[in-house]
Structures are given as structure tokens and as C-alpha cells.
């Protein structure tokens, strides 16, 4: 892999000073506030973007914000499944998860991916701690049944996929109080201890609601939400989102992302953004500068 230099490294001192000056009012405004970040896409697989993400998260913590990371891991799960001869399948953006797939999901998300993120943040000066839904009873869930579009009276069983029934945020708040950065794997647990695979966008949205987050940022592999002509939509209201769902503009993996974002906006999260995770330092650009890098979701 070619080690592409970080664009920030080639900025002149004057430009860097201007950037810091522009950030100051945002640092004041968001000091002490919780920022939930759904980390996924290319930003998880390209070394240059991994580094910029880790630096962004640590810098946000150092200047007084409280970042909480909820991570995905779809490509890593797909790779692990291929190694055992399985092919991933999806229904309405949700991964069909049989018992064998669930074992892989737990190992990949709660082990490999989570620990890589924790180590990456710690290596650049942060103090990250990994969690799954089982830790502190963080994410309680029940089996999810999907609506069958062909026959709504017959719900679709997609295996060990969960709906969140409760988020108990005490463990996250305790970590924040001790200046740690929580890194959460999207695995929930039922009352009987059954593990459930939960879409990371859904977990991020619910976590933002329960923590009373100031911002929710969903990282993706596109500039934001695009219309059918490929043009970036800078802002979306609830009414516009309904129209985009109806005409098929929003589909596939973007469905749970937009639905969770809208739910968070309706339930008290002040600012919800779909951001381009392929842009280095996209978190700093979205949070600490005048110019955003994606689509803003509003509840009205």
C-alpha cells in the first residue's frame, strides 16, 4: 500500500493558524458535550484514513469533547465468512445471521475489529476501552423480525439479528468521567444471554439518543446522501426522507443509516450528519469548522 501523506502535513503555518482560530468557537460551544461517531467504510480499511480518524478522536477528547465510537465491520465479517466458505446475504440492508455467522460476527466485531480500533486510538495518545452490549448490560436486545414486503402478514426471520430493547449507559458514562474513549461493538444480548447482531447504524443512533449527544456523525463511503442524479443533498427533512424512501433513492445499506439518523434527530440529538469518511480528518471538518462534509438530517 502506498503511504499517501496526510494533507494536513503540507499546509502552511498561516493556514494551520487560521484553521485553529476557526475551531475555537466550536471548541467552546461543544466543550463537555458527547459526540457519537459511527465508524465504518473505507475509513476502517485504508491506513491513511485510519490514522486521521484516530487523531481526530483523540484531539476531540483533548479539547474537552466526549467522543463515543460505535464501529461497524462489514468487510471484515465478509472476509472471515469467505474463509469458512460462507457468503453474506442481506435483507433491507440487514445481514442475515445464522448461528455460525453469529459466532463469526462476535469474534470479528468484539475481538479483532474492536481491539484494532482501541489500539489505534491508544497509540496516538488516547485512552480507549472496548465494550460490547454484554458489558454493564449496555445493549439489551430481542430477536428482530423484518417486514415482508410481499406479504406483510408473514414477517421475515433473518436469524440472530436484534432489535434494541434497552440501552443502559452507566458504563459508558463512567468511562467518560474517567477520560476514557468508549469503543462499542454492535452486539446485543437477550435476557437468556443469546447474542444478537445489531446494525451499527442503529446502535449509534440509539446510543446518541440515550447519552443525550450533541452530535451524531455517521461515516460512509459517499459524499453524503445523493439524489438519483448523483448530486449531494446538503440537508434532509423528515418529509424529504419519506419521499426518498418511497421512490427508491435511499435503499440498501443506506436505509438503516438514514432511519437511525432521523430517529435520533426526532429524539433530542441536536445535530445529525452523514459524513464522507473518505475525506481525511472528516470529523474535525464537520465538528470544528464552518464547512461541513456531508448531509445534515433534521426532524422537521
Swiss-Prot record:
InterPro entries: AceGlu_kinase-like_sf, AcgluKinase_fam, ArgB, Asp/Glu/Uridylate_kinase, Glu/AcGlu_kinase, NAGK-C. It is found in: Cytoplasm. GO terms for cellular component: cytoplasm. It catalyses: N-acetyl-L-glutamate + ATP = N-acetyl-L-glutamyl 5-phosphate + ADP. Coiled coil: none annotated. The keyword Cell inner membrane does not apply. GO terms for biological process: arginine biosynthetic process via ornithine; L-arginine biosynthetic process. Pathway: Amino-acid biosynthesis; L-arginine biosynthesis; N(2)-acetyl-L-ornithine from L-glutamate: step 2/4. Gene3D superfamilies: Acetylglutamate kinase-like (3.40.1160.10). One of its GO terms (molecular function) is ATP binding. The record marks 38, 257 as: Transition state stabilizer. Its main location: cytoplasm. Substrate binds at residues 73-74, 95, 197. Its EC number is 2.7.2.8. Keywords: Amino-acid biosynthesis, Arginine biosynthesis, ATP-binding, Cytoplasm, Kinase, Nucleotide-binding, Transferase. Catalyzes the ATP-dependent phosphorylation of N-acetyl-L-glutamate. Belongs to the acetylglutamate kinase family. ArgB subfamily. PANTHER family: N-ACETYLGLUTAMATE SYNTHASE (PTHR23342), N-ACETYLGLUTAMATE SYNTHASE, MITOCHONDRIAL (PTHR23342:SF0). This is Acetylglutamate kinase. The lineage of its organism: Bacteria, Pseudomonadati, Pseudomonadota, Betaproteobacteria, Burkholderiales.
Amino acid at each position: 500500500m502506498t503511504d499517501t501523506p496526510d494533507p494536513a502535513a503540507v499546509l502552511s503555518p498561516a493556514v494551520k493558524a487560521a484553521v485553529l482560530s476557526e475551531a475555537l468557537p466550536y471548541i467552546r460551544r461543544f466543550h463537555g458535550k458527547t459526540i457519537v461517531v459511527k465508524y465504518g467504510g473505507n475509513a476502517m480499511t485504508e491506513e491513511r484514513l485510519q490514522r486521521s480518524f484516530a487523531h481526530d478522536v483523540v484531539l476531540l477528547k483533548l479539547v474537552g469533547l466526549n467522543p463515543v465510537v460505535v464501529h461497524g465491520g462489514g468487510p471484515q465479517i465478509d472476509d472471515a465468512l469467505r474463509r469458512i466458505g460462507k457468503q453474506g446475504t442481506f435483507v433491507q440492508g440487514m445481514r442475515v445471521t445464522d448461528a455460525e455467522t453469529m459466532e463469526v460476527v462476535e469474534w470479528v466485531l468484539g475481538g479483532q475489529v474492536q481491539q484494532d480500533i482501541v489500539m489505534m486510538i491508544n497509540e496516538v495518545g488516547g485512552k480507549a476501552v472496548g465494550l460490547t452490549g454484554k458489558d454493564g448490560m449496555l445493549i439489551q436486545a430481542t430477536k428482530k423480525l423484518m417486514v415482508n414486503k410481499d406479504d406483510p402478514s408473514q414477517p421475515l426471520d433473518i436469524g440472530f439479528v436484534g432489535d434494541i430493547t434497552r440501552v443502559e449507559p452507566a458504563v459508558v458514562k463512567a468511562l467518560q468521567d474517567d477520560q476514557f474513549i468508549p469503543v462499542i461493538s454492535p452486539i446485543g444480548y437477550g435476557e437468556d444471554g443469546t447474542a444478537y447482531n445489531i446494525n451499527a447504524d442503529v446502535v449509534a443512533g440509539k446510543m446518541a439518543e440515550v447519552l443525550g449527544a450533541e452530535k451524531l456523525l455517521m461515516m460512509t463511503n459517499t459524499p453524503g446522501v445523493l439524489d438519483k442524479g448523483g448530486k449531494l443533498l446538503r440537508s434532509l427533512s423528515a418529509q424529504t426522507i419519506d419521499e426518498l424512501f418511497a421512490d427508491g433513492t435511499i435503499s440498501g445499506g443506506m436505509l438503516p443509516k438514514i432511519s437511525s439518523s432521523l430517529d435520533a434527530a426526532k429524539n433530542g440529538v441536536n445535530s445529525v450528519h452523514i459524513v464522507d469518511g473518505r475525506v481525511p480528518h472528516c470529523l474535525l471538518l464537520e465538528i470544528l469548522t464552518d464547512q461541513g462534509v456531508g448531509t445534515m438530517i433534521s426532524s422537521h
